[in-house]
Amino acid sequence: MTPMRATIAAVLLTLFAISANSEDAPKENAYVTELIQQLGPNAKKPAGEVFKNVQLMKDVPADRFLRIMDTGYRQSLGVSCDYCHVEDRWEADEKRPKRAAREMILMMRMINKHLGELTEIDSQAAAVNCTTCHRGYVKPALQMR
């Protein structure tokens, strides 16, 4: 499985899990919905062509990229966009959480790649994502409750 496919699979798994119970499913951030509408015809262009400084997921359509940022990251960590981003300077890399998120994406890809190589599990369905560890909190739980 390619790193991009592993990332997309993990994000889709997260989105599916969140939407499984529509009453409990988090609603899309109104700001993200507005941004997607403002994209107009650029919504289906690759994120790397639409946004500045996209280093990972460059080929993901811009509208899906924003939804991944919203559901896959913001909601998975229980934060707002400005936790990682400087508002109105989204491309800026000065915040440590944004740089850490990139490292975590690479770690997630590596784990998902190795999950796909395991022979004693259903590797087609096995995937980890941000929610796997973070569960809505910035700091993952390090012990069972």
Please describe what each predicted stretch is:
Residues 1-8:
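Bacterial N-terminal signal peptides that target proteins for export
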Residues 9-17:
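Bacterial N-terminal signal peptides
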Residues 18-22:
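Sec/Tat signal peptide C-region and signal peptidase I cleavage site
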Residues 23-145:
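Sequence context surrounding c-type heme c attachment/ligation sites in exported
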